[in-house]
UniProtKB/Swiss-Prot annotation:
A zinc finger (unnamed) spans 27-63, 100-136. The gene is E6. This is Protein E6. Disulfide bonds: none annotated. It holds the Pfam family E6.
Length: 140
């Protein structure tokens, strides 16, 4: 909210005095109305609203997956074993922001540690670290 505009859904609801259940936001990519389940997912993933052309936009789950795949295919920088991530990032694993490579959900500490102990890779995409969350790794 550096420019005064709310970026998080809860800030948006507070700022405009709207109940979460009454939100009607459009997907930035497909222009469909983002349903309540996808809005909840968007909120839990701690994603930011986009303000463009005087309107606020969110993103539906399907477009998030497509966006994640697009970024992986077009902005991939490198991959490293998770055991080397702390050394490369020069921060503790709990301090490193890692999103899921498939669904863009923020990984919690358990998922980050699972990356380490199961010898998985982490991927640098667009300057941000990615790995598999517990839901998407099962779908592989």
């Amino acid at each position: 909210m550096a420019d005064g505009r709310p970026a998080a859904l809860d800030d948006f609801c507070r700022r405009f005095d709207i109940s979460f259940f009454d939100l009607h936001l459009t997907c930035i990519f497909c222009s469909h109305t983002v349903d309540l389940q996808d809005l909840a997912s968007f909120y839990l993933k701690k994603l930011s609203l986009v303000f463009r052309g005087g309107c606020y936009y969110a993103c539906c789950s399907e477009c998030l997956r497509l966006s994640a795949r697009f970024e992986q295919e077009n902005y991939f920088q490198c991959s490293i074993k998770a055991v080397n991530l702390e050394e490369v990032a020069q921060r503790k694993i709990k301090e490193i922001c890692i999103r899921c490579i498939c669904c863009l959900r923020l990984l919690d500490i358990v998922e980050k540690l699972d990356l380490l102990y199961s010898d998985q890779a982490c991927y640098l995409i667009r300057g941000l670290w990615r790995g598999y969350c517990r839901n998407c790794i099962r779908k592989q």
